[in-house]
A protein has these predicted regions:
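Transmembrane helical bundles and short interhelical boundary loops of multi-pass, membrane-embedded
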Residues: 106-108, 116, 149, 153, ...
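Short acidic/glycine- and proline-prone juxtamembrane loop motifs at membrane-interface regions
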Residues: 75-89, 133
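Interfacial juxtamembrane loops and adjacent helix segments
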Residues: 1-40, 488-492
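Short helix- or helix-capping micro-motifs
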Residues: 63-71, 78, 124, 128
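Lectin-like carbohydrate-binding module/patch detector with strong preference for beta-trefoil
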Residues: 190-443
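Transmembrane-helix motifs of polytopic, lipid-linked glycan transferases
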Residues: 32, 36-57, 95
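Transmembrane-embedded, aromatic-rich helix segments that form part
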Residues: 118-119, 133-151
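Specific aromatic-rich, kink-prone transmembrane helix
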Residues: 48-51, 88-109, 116, 120-124, ...
Length: 650
């Protein structure tokens, strides 16, 4: 929404659909206004790093170094130059940390204390609103809050009521406020975006029907209750596809030698099509029209589903499915005049019913179709049929599933009352407009829940990507991402780290752990190397640098989906903040002699010069200018994984 605000302020007229990454922008897209938002957030990381370091107790020189290191990170520079979310996430994460540190330093329950508490919760809510990984920042802040509560609980000068008040205030400010702010952003989002868009098919039929100009335009005249004789399309709630059949049959034998029923194929087709229409037929009647008055189909009723075009009944039997042999095959029954009889009876179970007498409703009801003879459930298996099945998703009958499998939920999306027994007239009905109007509305909480569920569970079918990397490759700096290349020269933009900076940060993580273990062992033996105030500052620096890095890095070790280098940027931001804290700690508390301190300062100056030289050396790949020769590009390669592009004509 912040990016959309930038586009709005840049007078964007909406005439660009953002369907493909890398698509060339037309003249109507205000590129500068869009890029201004992440660029501003990227720029703010520098003063935020300075303020955070100052709040940790670092000297002005140490805090200045923190901001300078942020400025010289090529990866942050590159990411902030594009319309991407990471700069916003990092900015709000650092703002959350700064506010949490300010809250910790403020006098309890003073006006400024309440202000910083609300600011911390707001910043955390904004971080979560940018990306779900903002939750990791919230957890980091909650760890600090929990340590404060633990410290207060041991303070005997405080009453039990006062400690409880601290707990309640932090729960309200650091948990409830971010949650309310997160929900509020979606409320505003849904208030502003009420029209249909190009990716509506990812959402449920009920969600789509609540949007203007999309499915609502198609379904606005539908009858509400499904009746015997109704003509319907059935959409899977799990996958954006519709129950479908065509005249092709299953092959007599599959590639693995198994035999099939050679019946008419039933699939789940991902596009709207005339072959998606089915007629809900009463099992004891030959009528294919809706009675007057209509007889609604209710929970528990037995129905037959007649394919509208081929006039074959939906069927299943004890034959293994084509791709998922642990399930039964689903077909439209073809009578070959052999001993295998059709079993075209299905029991309707309305899953979201208010009572057992509830009727089957268009768009509103989620239903399961239970095969009566075998007690199996109609569902999308998740597999895709081979060429003989036109690459369409497989539909199977599985054993009764508890809990309910998402692929077994079906929704009537399009619905009309059939009026003709003649096949030609029925086909004409399927192509004619719907005559009635029944509005379908979905409440905010239902929309909010569905959006969260889709964001958590939906995965685009991943293909092998050139720049996919692993978390361990991030630590070795053996991966990069090409963002742009000039069509005529070698000018290009790559997402690359500053090698000297990132290696130094990883070394500092190890050194901090070694120092922490040493201090803890000596304190266990009654030896305190640091005064209480310095020890607390040392722990606080570790909470921020080591804890922030681990909190934003370790979860990716458990992630199975494809990852890219930009996923590491929030963690890299935190480990960069540890460098000046550890250097100042070494200068103040570890190196005692004047000569040693001069040597440390000289080493720091030399190291900082190397970091700056590395930044300048890689700047052409961060900014896209000037164009480099193939030999120059080769000289910049720190790792074999840095896959630079060379123009064929260069």
């Amino acid at each position: 929404m912040l990016l959309a605000l930038g586009a709005y302020l840049g007078d964007f007229n909406g005439n660009f659909t953002w369907e493909r990454i890398g698509a060339e922008y037309n003249a109507a897209v205000p590129v500068r206004a869009l890029r201004a938002v992440p660029a501003l957030c990227g720029a703010l990381t520098v003063p935020l790093a300075y303020l955070i370091s100052s709040q940790l107790g670092l000297s002005p020189l140490g805090a200045f170094l923190a901001g300078l290191l942020m400025l010289m990170d090529n990866a942050l520079l590159t990411q902030s130059r594009f319309v991407l979310l990471e700069p916003l996430l990092i900015c709000f994460s650092l703002l959350s940390v700064l506010c949490a540190l300010k809250l910790r330093a403020a006098r309890s329950f003073s006006v400024s204390w309440w202000g910083w508490l609300l600011a911390t919760g707001t910043a955390c809510g904004l971080a979560i609103g940018v990306k779900y990984t903002g939750v990791l920042t919230l957890l980091l802040v909650c760890v600090l809050a929990a340590s404060d509560i633990w410290r207060l609980a041991g303070d005997r000068t405080l009453t039990h009521l006062c400690v409880c008040a601290h707990v309640v205030a932090r729960v309200a400010g650091l948990l409830l406020l971010p949650l309310l702010l997160y929900v509020a952003t979606f409320w505003l989002h849904l208030q502003l975006l009420q029209n249909a868009g190009p990716h509506d098919h990812l959402m449920s039929s009920a969600f789509q029907a609540s949007l203007k100009g999309g499915l609502a335009r198609i379904t606005q005249g539908q009858p509400l209750e499904v009746a015997f004789g109704s003509q319907v399309t059935l959409r899977s709630a799990h996958t954006p596809c519709w129950l479908h059949s065509h005249f092709d049959v299953y092959p007599i034998t599959y590639a693995d030698g198994r035999g099939s029923s050679h019946q008419q194929q039933v699939t789940c087709y991902p596009y709207k099509d005339i072959n998606n229409w089915w007629i809900i037929k009463h099992p004891h009647s030959q009528s294919l029209v809706v009675d007057s008055p209509p007889v609604p189909v209710r929970h528990g009723d037995i129905v037959q589903l007649l394919h509208g075009i081929s006039t074959k009944l939906l069927n299943s039997h004890n034959v293994a499915a084509a791709i998922t042999p642990t399930c039964q095959e689903v077909s439209c029954y073809v009578d070959y005049n052999i001993s295998m009889q059709g079993q075209p009876w299905w029991r309707v179970e309305v899953l979201n019913r208010a009572s057992d007498s509830d009727s089957w409703k268009t768009i509103v009801s989620d239903v399961q179709l239970i095969h009566v003879n075998t007690s199996t459930v109609l569902r999308v298996s998740g597999a895709v049929l081979p060429e003989w099945g036109h690459g369409q998703p497989e539909v199977v009958a599985d054993l009764t599933l508890r809990p309910v499998h998402p692929g077994s939920r079906w929704t009537v999306e399009e619905h009309r009352h059939g009026r003709s027994q003649e096949q030609a007239e029925r086909e004409q009905e399927l192509r004619s407009p719907i005559p009635k109007h029944v509005p379908h509305d979905l409440g905010f909480l239902a929309k909010f829940y569905e959006l969260q569920w889709k964001m958590l569970t939906f995965r685009v079918e991943e293909q092998e990507h050139r720049y996919i990397s692993t978390p361990l490759q991030w630590l070795r700096m053996s991966s990069s991402i090409a963002y742009w290349m000039d069509p005529h020269t070698n000018a290009q933009i790559h997402l690359l780290p500053n090698p000297w900076l990132w290696v130094s940060a990883c070394v500092c993580l190890l050194l901090y752990c070694a120092c922490l273990v040493r201090y803890l062992l000596r304190r266990q033996r009654g030896i305190s190397d640091l005064p209480a105030e310095c020890w607390e500052r040392f722990l606080l620096a570790g909470w921020l640098g080591l804890g922030g890095w681990a909190m934003h890095f370790v979860p990716y070790l458990l992630t199975e989906r494809g990852l890219f280098l930009y996923h590491y940027l929030p963690a890299a931001t935190f480990h960069t903040l540890l460098i000046p804290a550890l250097l100042e700690h070494a200068h103040t508390h570890v190196v005692r002699s004047p000569a040693g301190r001069y040597a440390l300062l000289a080493g720091c100056v030399a190291w900082l010069a190397a970091v700056y030289a590395s930044h300048v050396q890689l700047a052409p790949l961060s900014k896209g200018t000037p164009a480099l020769s193939a030999q120059q590009l080769s000289s910049l390669r720190w790792s074999e994984g840095w896959d630079f592009l060379v123009h064929p004509t260069q």
